[in-house]
Amino acid sequence: NREQFGRSLTGFQLIQEKLARMEANTVTGLGLSDRLATLQAAGEFAEVPASVAKMQNARLLRETTALGREICGGNGITVEHKVAKFFGDAEAIYSYEGTHEVNSLIIGRHLTGKGAFV
């Protein structure tokens, strides 16, 4: 319920655009996760779909929390507001969830038939 210039932040176009992107990221991530769960339930779990979901969902989480932090302005970086903790958690997940780079190499090997691991 934060206000700026006597108006609710949710009434500003750029805030609504950020909220829309956050929603799209959430729906996309859930769709990837659902597809992966469906494959696993059918006994068709494979490394590449898992890497796609991990890489993309970690990236989407990182972007979504950054957008939330932007919406909160200066409050988005203070410990009194949870968005700063979420942002830190998202950075950790982006790094430890197999790392974006490693998952991209797994996907790249699948697409090209050539391993680029060094």
Task: Give a label for each model feature.
Residues 1-118:
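Alpha-helical interface subdomain recognition
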